[in-house]
Each structure stands twice: as structure tokens, then as C-alpha cells.
């Protein structure tokens, strides 16, 4: 049995008057119609590369660089713990990404020399003017990498949060809302929040969370840009200015009173 949660239609009619629920209900009903065509749960098969060794990591970063130079937008996401980059994710398609961890339960994941080489490879991608980058709340990642490592993002930089807020200004623009609207990925943001706030979950869950955060923007941004590029109907011309009213006519003069009768 497949279930799609949705707001009750009565929430956008009197007395609720929550009109913003109407387009959300419409989208959910369209999704329900699509899902009713088959019994199975069908989602895109996605791959998040975790626990890669140094050589595998460098090879994947070189692959990202080549694809980026060919026109593929590259997703970037960093996870910061106590002011340090805990892991960094890169996505190069709607179904492929890597999480590069810098620590795990045993301490540092890479040696200092390996970590330096990895960050230089990441910098080559981020600083290349011919490679388009995208991220969720990308302004945070960009300023952090600039101040912490001196990595200056160049080229086309896209942010799903900004694109979402311009496209749909009345609705949430976080990555959870973007994921729901533009992908078939189930809700996963709680995994990262629980890991950060309560330390619950496994390292694998944390790295998968980072990989999804780098992957989702790659799938979402083309759809968001399509909405932004749609021609909007022009505003109707203002009504013509009515001619000025003529000045009112002066009231007619009363005739003089008749002369008095003779005595």
C-alpha cells in the first residue's frame, strides 16, 4: 500500500482560508495520480561514494573536473563541525555524488599530505571559471571556503535556496522543500540534524546525508532555472488618462426684480 500525505482540501476554503495549501494539494494529487499507475515504489537508483581511499578520491575529483569543463554543473556541500570542515560532498549528476570525510571514529581519515592534495583538487574545481557550481545555501559554503582556505569560487554559481525563493516566494526554500518538489528522494534531513545535535546515527548515515546534499542541487537547479526563464505575461498597460473635466458653468444669473408698480 502506497501512501502520499497531503493537506486536507478543507484547509484552503472557509473557515480555514489557508490559500497557500491549494498548490501543494494539487502537486500531491498529481503525484498520487502518477503513483497509482503501478504498484511498486519506483525511484531513481542513486550512488553515493563513501569510504573512498586517497587514490579513489583523487580520481573521482579529476572526473568531476573533466565533466565540469564539459558543461556539467557540479554540486558542492560542506558540513562544518566546531568551525572545521568535517566532510565535503561533490555531485556530478542527479544520481552520483561523493562524500569526502576528514575524520571518523578512529581519528583523521587522511594524512595531512593527502588532505592537502584533496583540498587542492577541490579548489581546482571551485576556482575554475568554466565550471558551473551549485549548492543549497551556497553563500555559506562559498564564504567559508574563502575565509578558511582561501578558495575563491569563480564561474557560474547557483543557489537552490535563492532560486526557490524567487520562483515560489510564498513557500519554504530549504533543501527539504526543494527535494520534495524537484526529486523523488524521501525526506532525509532529519538524519543530519540528529547527527549534529544529538550525535545519534552512524558515520555512514552522516556521509550519505552529505552526499545527498551535494546531489539534490544538481537535479533541482535545471528545473528551477527553467521556471525562472519562463516568459511572464507583460503587465497590462495603464488605463489612458481621462481628459480633464471642463470647468463647471457659472450658475445662471437671476433676472432683476420687476420695478414696483406706479402709485
Language model features: what each stretch is:
Residues 1-44:
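Glycine/proline-rich loop-helix segments at beta-alpha junctions forming the active-site rim
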Residues 5, 74-76, 156:
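Residue-level marker for buried hydrophobic side chains located in beta-strands
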Residues 10-12, 36-52, 84, 94-229:
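Active-site-proximal helix-loop-helix substrate-binding element of RNase H-like nuclease domains
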Residues 31-74:
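DnaQ-like (DEDDh/DEDDy) 3′-5′ exonuclease domain used for proofreading
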Residues 64-91:
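Gly/Thr-rich phosphate-binding beta-strand-loop-beta motif of the actin/hexokinase/Hsp70
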Residues 235-244, 262-263:
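Extended, well-ordered alpha-helical scaffold/bundle regions in very large, multi-domain proteins
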Residues 253-254:
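Basic polycationic patches enriched in arginine
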Amino acid at each position: 500500500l502506497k501512501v502520499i500525505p497531503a493537506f486536507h482540501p478543507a484547509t484552503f476554503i472557509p473557515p480555514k482560508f489557508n490559500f497557500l495549501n491549494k498548490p501543494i494539494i494539487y502537486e500531491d494529487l498529481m503525484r498520487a495520480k502518477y503513483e497509482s499507475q503501478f504498484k511498486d515504489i519506483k525511484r531513481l537508483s542513486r550512488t553515493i561514494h563513501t569510504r573512498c581511499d586517497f587514490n579513489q578520491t583523487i580520481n573521482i575529483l579529476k572526473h568531476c573536473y573533466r565533466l565540469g569543463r564539459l558543461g556539467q554543473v557540479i554540486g558542492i556541500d560542506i558540513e562544518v563541525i566546531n568551525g572545521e570542515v568535517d566532510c565535503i560532498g561533490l555531485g556530478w549528476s542527479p544520481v552520483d555524488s561523493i562524500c569526502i570525510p576528514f575524520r571518523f571514529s578512529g581519528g583523521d581519515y587522511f594524512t595531512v599530505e593527502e588532505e592537502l592534495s584533496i583540498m587542492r583538487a577541490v579548489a581546482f574545481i571551485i576556482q575554475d571559471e568554466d565550471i558551473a557550481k551549485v549548492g543549497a545555501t551556497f553563500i555559506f559554503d562559498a564564504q567559508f571556503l574563502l575565509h578558511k582556505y582561501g578558495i575563491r569560487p569563480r564561474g557560474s554559481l547557483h543557489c537552490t535556496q535563492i532560486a526557490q525563493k524567487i520562483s515560489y516566494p510564498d513557500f519554504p526554500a530549504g533543501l527539504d522543500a526543494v527535494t520534495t518538489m524537484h526529486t523523488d528522494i524521501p525526506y532525509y534531513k532529519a538524519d543530519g540534524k540528529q547527527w549534529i545535535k544529538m550525535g545519534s546515527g552512524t558515520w555512514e548515515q552522516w556521509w550519505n546525508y552529505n552526499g545527498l546534499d551535494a546531489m539534490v542541487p544538481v537535479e533541482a537547479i535545471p528545473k528551477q532555472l527553467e521556471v525562472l526563464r519562463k516568459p511572464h505575461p507583460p503587465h497590462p498597460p495603464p488605463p489612458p488618462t481621462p481628459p480633464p473635466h471642463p470647468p463647471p458653468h457659472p450658475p445662471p444669473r437671476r433676472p432683476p426684480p420687476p420695478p414696483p408698480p406706479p402709485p
